[in-house]
Every structure is written in C-alpha cells, then in structure tokens.
C-alpha cells in the first residue's frame, strides 16, 4: 500500500511539474525519484482484472530513464516523459480498481489483488518515497493492529432510522402523545408532541427521551445542539404502527424546557449539558441520550389559547424538538463523511464492473446496512478499499 501511494504521488507530481519550459534544475530531484521508480519497475510483469466485468490486463515495464539537461525541458523531453507517465497512471488506476472490488472475510486489511500483493514485495520498497497520507498512516497502524485515528467532518455514524413511539394512543388517533425522530448521517432530529398540550399531565409537563447508540466510539467531537427539529415542523400524514390506518400530525412549535444531553461510554456518563445550545464538545462516547420537556404555557394570549383548548377536538398539536449534529470527530474506524468521496468511488466502481456480492459487503454497498452491522471484517475491508480509493483519487477524479 505504501508503494502504491508513492507511485501515485510521484506520478501526480511528475504530471503537474514536468512541463515544457520548466527549468531542469527546478525538477531535478523529482526526475531522479521518477527514474528510481522506473529502475525498480522495469523488467516486471503484472496482471489486473478478471472479476465481474473487469477485463484482464497484462502490464510490462521496460522504459528508458529520463535524461539530464542544462536548460529548460523541451517538447521532445516532455513528450517522452508524458508517454511513460500515462502508462504508469493507467497501471495505478487499474491496480486500484482491482483492489477496490475485492474483499475477504479474513485479514481484509491486507492486499487482496495479485498486483498489489506483488507490489508489497521487498524489491519494490525502494519506491516508498512518501508515507504522509492519513489513510496510509492508519492503514499501517491497523495492519499492525495498533490504534488508529481518523478525523471526520460530519461523519456518517448514524444508520438511517425514522419512526415514532406513542405514549398515549386512542383508536381514533385524535389525542396522541409521543416522540418522532429521524437519525441519519451525522444528525439526529427528535420531536416530542402532545395533542392536548399536556393539559392533564403532572404540572402540565410532558417528559421525552431519545437514546441513540453509536456503532463505533467517537472522540473529541464538536457538536451543534439546537432547540428545534425543523423536519417535524410542518403538517403530515403518518402511517400507524400496524399499517392499518393513518393519523394526522399538525404541529405548533414550542420551545423545549429542561433540555439535557448526555454522552456516555460503556454506560458511564462522560459529558452532560443542560439548557446549553450552539456548539458543545464531547470527549469520547458511544451513546447519546437526549431528554427534554413540553410545558403547557401558563399564560396565553387568546390567540394561543385558541390553539390549545382544554378539551377535544385538538386541531393543533403542541410540539417541541431538538437537533443534534456532529460537525467533526475522531474515530478509530473508517467512516464515510461529508468531506470525502471514498464511499461513492468504491460503490461506483463496483457497480460499473458488475462485481458480484461477496462475503463481506452488503449489496450495493448499502451504508445503513454496513454501519448497522459494522463487523471487524467489514472494518478491515472498508479501511483497505477506502485507502486505495484515496490513492486513486490523486490521479483520477
């Protein structure tokens, strides 16, 4: 993997900097590095493909070295270099694709394609010029079963979940009380509602709670907490739990009271925030517990009192909500996030070449399925293919 990264980095630099008119002295170190790559690769043969619709391709390396010059690089020099660069870029692209479409239930962190296994041999270590990629660093750590750490922006840590629970229900569905939520990606939105606006509740207050368990521990997380859940702020028709009927939800938004968010790790509270909104942080956690209250307004103008009568029919439904959004965090496991396209790259390649469903990844690389059942085997394989996707993205956009 280190060698593949160094190949890609060298080729990217060569493609960007070996251009007509450039002073040789400005790129002499790069050309020496490029020639070392050629010396190491010359005389070797590789084969890629042969899975799904990915065609078999054979690769042979026998290239002349780039020479020295006292002046600027001329058109002939650049054309010779460009032909070599293009062949190598095509080779690296195919090695990456060949690796991204393979998976293994055992030791999935290790190279799975014949071509990358061969590049892992000792004779190619002379190509290992650069090991500065976060993905490469973490791949090396994971390969040695040491602690890794990925920094994510808006990590997709929450499997998609959209549902409701009813704490009070009637056959006519005209006087309900309960909780609705939508968890997806890096965001939780939860709303508590009471058709009667807590008219008969103790102290005219209803208590709500929403607990979300993460599939992986997050550390040093920056989080936004807002006293609103905009996705539940408009009328809708909701299917009943048994699917036999539907019920009408017509929210009128109130501000939540006594809001508390707890971040827990292995059942122990690590951080707690009460009535604090905006930006908060959490040290390390695997569970989030949100609790909040709906309090019937003690003093109401006639217009507000008309919204919340003391008896049925309840045409407007008192609702309070919270939004929790993980802006950034560190995780030992690789995740899809908002700042990278690794999941899309891997998924599109597997779809393009009609790769059959293997023993590890779900059909279509369904992220909700993958993160819901994030086994060690999936973690190893995902880190490997994401690392390869990051290498490929240096050359192929």
From Swiss-Prot:
| Coiled coil stretches, renumbered | none
* One of the record's GO cellular component terms: viral intermediate capsid
Q: Which GO terms describe its biological process?
A: fusion of virus membrane with host plasma membrane
Q: Which InterPro entries match?
A: Capsid_hemagglutn (IPR008980), Rotavirus_A/C_VP6 (IPR001385), Virus_capsid_a-hlx_vir (IPR008935)
User: What are the disulfide bonds?
Assistant: none
Query: GO: which molecular function terms?
Result: host cell surface receptor binding; metal ion binding; structural molecule activity
Q: Briefly state the modifications made to the protein after translation.
A: The N-terminus is blocked.
Keywords linked to the UniProt accession: Calcium, Capsid protein, Intermediate capsid protein, Metal-binding, Ubl conjugation, Virion, Zinc
Q: Which Pfam families match?
A: Rota_Capsid_VP6
**Chief place of localization:** virion
> For the region Interaction with the inner capsid protein VP2, what residue ranges are annotated?
62-73
* Positions that bind Zn(2+): 153
* Positions with a binding annotation for Ca(2+): 266, 286
What HAMAP family does the record point to? Rota_VP6, Rota_VP6_A
Q: Could you say which protein family the record assigns here?
A: Belongs to the rotavirus VP6 family.
This molecule's function is given as: Intermediate capsid protein that self assembles to form an icosahedral capsid with a T=13 symmetry, which consists of 230 trimers of VP6, with channels at each of its five-fold vertices. This capsid constitutes the middle concentric layer of the viral mature particle. The innermost VP2 capsid and the intermediate VP6 capsid remain intact following cell entry to protect the dsRNA from degradation and to prevent unfavorable antiviral responses in the host cell during all the replication cycle of the virus.
The annotated subunit structure for this chain is:
Homotrimer. Interacts with the inner capsid protein VP2. Interacts with the outer capsid glycoprotein VP7. Interacts with the outer capsid protein VP5*.
Q: What else is known?
A: The VP6 trimer contains a zinc ion located at the center of the molecule. The zinc ion is not essential for either trimerization or transcription activity of the DLP. Zinc-depleted VP6 has an increased sensitivity to proteases.
**Which named protein is this?**
Intermediate capsid protein VP6
């Amino acid at each position: 993997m280190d060698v593949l990264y160094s190949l890609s980095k060298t080729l990217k630099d060569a493609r960007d900097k070996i251009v007509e008119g450039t002073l040789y002295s400005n790129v002499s170190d790069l050309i020496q590095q490029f020639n070392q790559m050629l010396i190491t690769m010359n005389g070797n043969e590789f084969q890629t493909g042969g899975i799904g619709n990915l065609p078999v391709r054979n690769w042979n390396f026998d290239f002349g070295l780039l020479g020295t010059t006292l002046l600027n690089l001329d058109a002939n020099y650049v054309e010779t270099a460009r032909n070599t660069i293009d062949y190598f870029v095509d080779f690296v692209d195919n090695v990456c694709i060949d690796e991204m479409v393979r998976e293994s239930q055992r030791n999935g962190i290790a190279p799975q394609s014949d071509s990358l296994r061969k590049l892992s041999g000792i004779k190619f270590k002379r190509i290992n010029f650069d090991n500065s990629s976060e993905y490469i660093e973490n791949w090396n750590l994971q390969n040695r079963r040491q602690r890794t750490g990925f920094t994510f922006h808006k990590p997709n840590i929450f499997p998609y979940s959209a549902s409701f629970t009813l704490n009070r229900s009637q056959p006519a569905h005209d006087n309900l009380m309960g909780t609705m939520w939508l968890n997806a990606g890096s965001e939780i939105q939860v709303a508590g509602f009471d058709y009667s606006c807590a008219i008969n509740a103790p102290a005219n207050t209803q208590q709500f709670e929403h607990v979300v368990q993460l599939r992986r521990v997050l550390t040093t997380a920056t989080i936004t907490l807002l006293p609103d859940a905009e996705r539940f702020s408009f009328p809708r028709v909701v299917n009943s739990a048994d699917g036999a009927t539907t019920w009408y939800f017509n929210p009128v938004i109130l501000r939540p009271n006594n809001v508390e968010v707890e971040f827990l790790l292995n059942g122990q509270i690590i951080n707690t925030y009460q009535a604090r909104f905006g930006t908060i942080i959490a040290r390390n956690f695997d569970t989030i517990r949100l609790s909040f209250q709906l309090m019937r307004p003690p003093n109401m103008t006639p217009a507000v009192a008309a919204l919340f009568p003391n008896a049925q029919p309840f045409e407007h439904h008192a609702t309070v909500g919270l939004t929790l959004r993980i802006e950034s965090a560190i995780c030992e496991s690789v995740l899809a996030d908002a700042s990278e396209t690794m999941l899309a790259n891997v998924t599109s390649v597997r779809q393009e070449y009609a790769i059959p469903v293997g023993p590890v990844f779900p059909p279509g690389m369904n992220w909700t399925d993958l993160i819901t059942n994030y086994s060690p085997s999936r973690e190893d394989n995902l880190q490997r293919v994401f690392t390869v996707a990051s290498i490929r993205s240096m050359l192929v956009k």
